[in-house]
Every structure is written in C-alpha cells, then in structure tokens.
Amino acid sequence: SLVGSEMCIRDRGLSYGGSLARTEATGYGLLYLTEEMLKCNGKDIAGKTVTVSGAGNVAIYAIQKAEQLGAKVVTCSDSTGWIYDPEGIDVALLREVKEVKRARLTEYAAARPSAQYHEKKNGEHGVWTVKCDVALPCATQNELDLEDAKQLVANGVFAVAEGANMPTTMEATEYFQKNGVLFCPGKASNAGGVATSALEMSQNSERLSWTFEEVDAKLKNIMVNIFHNLDDAAKKYGMEGNYVAGANIAGFLKVAEAMTAQGIC
C-alpha cells in the first residue's frame, strides 16, 4: 500500500487511487477564488467579460467554470497564436481541438465562424489587448508584462488572478496594485490542483472514492477559505486589498506556527 509510505504519488488514474475532479481542479479553483474575491469587493463574475491565456489544462477548465458561473470568456492562446471569439469560447470545441486532436488553435478558428485567429508575433501583446473586466493568465511564467498591464488597465480591467505559476511580472503586478486592480497571486489562486491532490490522499487513507460533486464542493470550500485567509492577513497587518502581501503573510505564519509547535525554531 502507498498509504503511510515515505513517498507519495499523486494525479493517478482512477483505477489505482486517483480522484475525480483532479483534472479540472486548478482551473475550477482559480474561478472559485476569483468569484469570492469579486464578491467581497461588491462585484459579481456573472455577466463579466473575461480574457484567458493558454489552452492547456488550467485554461480549459478555467474557461469552463467561468462560463458555468455566467461570465463570457472571449480569448485563449497557445504557443503559435491566439483566439478572439466575441461570442464566447466554445469549450466543447476547444476540448476537442486540444484534448482529442492535440491540434493548434487554427483548427478551432476553422470550425468556429465567430472566432478570429491571430498568429503569434514577437512583441505583440496578444490576448491582453482585448477589452475585459477580468484577466486570467493561465499559460506560462512572465507572460504578462508592464505594457500588457497598462493596456489592460486602459481597457478597464478590474481584477486579475493568476492561473499559471508567476505569469505576471513584478512590474506588472505593482502597476495593477497602484491602479486599484484586484490582483491575486498564483500561490493562492492556483492552489486548487495541489489542494485536490491532498483530497486524493484523504480518500486513499480512508479507502474511499468521493463523487465528482463531493470533491468539487470541498475544492470550492478550500479556495474560498484561502481567499479569506489572505484577505484577513492583509487587513490585520494594515495592507487591506493587497492580496500579494496577504498571501505572503498568511503563508509565512502558517509555516512559522508549525515549525514553532514542533520545536524546529
């Protein structure tokens, strides 16, 4: 048995201890936290226009959950180009292109009359030139720079949450904060994947297999709690609304308290 062993294998197949909803977890979790962040600032994600970068696991399921919550996602991208679809990204078609055919977004554009395909060009700012309310970078590190941030702010963005690991440069992050944009760092907003891996381990330890809905509900609760932990930390230390500082403080305190309790420091 893997339970109780010194090593842990996660993201396994369902037939050997994996968990339902693990595939969707990072993208879904991103939206659950974003939804809560907006709600706590007097806004609702329903009816909002969202731009997403990427077309991999995180992006696809972020788009799917955003649309389930009533938002319209109008962009996605891959390494060769990006899509602007003013009618809203067709998630079923995107999944067919990316998960079944393993093809490029040119195939999405060819099958979707409302979609506009833009080939990637050096120096071009891609999806971040599109007017939106909420921006979700879900592609790669340092993909959203200062010029992108300026374009987004000029176009009226009011919230940015990271789906990828560190996709926003430090300069862009600071620009968002100075201009009153709600900004949540990936260390909090993309935690849904690793959180669901922990839920997978919980199921293994009890020899249980929860339904998709059970895992999804627990994931949402975790992401909502993460947001409130960082929000509370930011307020407590005099930095209300600074979710980067809140995430850093909350994370540090959790580790420090555990180390102190175990006599490590």
Q: Which residues fall in each region the model found?
A:
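Adenosine-phosphate binding glycine-rich loop
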Residues: 153-265
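Short, small-residue-biased leader/transition segments that mark boundaries at the very start
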Residues: 2-8
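Glycine/charged-rich beta-loop-alpha catalytic/anionic-binding loops adjacent to active sites
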Residues: 9-17, 179-180
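Glycine-rich phosphate/diphosphate-binding loop of Rossmann-like nucleotide-binding domains
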Residues: 13, 18-24, 28-131
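Rossmann-like adenosine-cofactor binding region
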Residues: 81-183, 188
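Conserved structured core elements
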Residues: 24, 28, 44-48, 52, ...
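Alpha-helical scaffold segments in soluble metabolic enzymes
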Residues: 29-36, 40, 61, 65, ...
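Helical "substrate-binding/catalytic lid" subdomain
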Residues: 5, 18, 22, 26, ...
